[in-house]
Amino acid sequence: NIRFAVSSLKPTEHRLEIKQSLAGSTLIDDAYNANPEGSIEALHVLSRFDNMKKVVITPGLIELGTREHDCNFALGLEAAKICDIIIFVGINRSAPLKEGAMSQHFPEDKLFVAASFKEAMEIYSGFADKNTVVLLENDLPDNYLN
């Protein structure tokens, strides 16, 4: 029976997978998403969490050739439209992301740049609570970050 088959399907890990996180917050784990369109759509999923503080943690997108700067600018811009707090990961990689967010006049005191995912989670832990939802978007290995 088709209904039974569909009901028994398991979501693909790290693809918009919803989990509990720090201090009772909600985590949208989209760590395996590394394409521009999918990353923007993941932010749109985040936007649907009404009455919650919205956070994104992302190193941006890589290996896009001449499109890389523009795609990361667009990701930062869209994050600024949706999020209350933004944490970019990678000191040297985050410039186009930050430019995009700042083009929307995102408050600088709500924008953080972490050197690693570990540091990003430490920053996040400072304001995580049951009314917070965080999107973990594209979990790059540390060798790409700086």
Predicted regions and their residues:
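ATP-dependent carboxylate-amine ligase
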Residues: 3-146
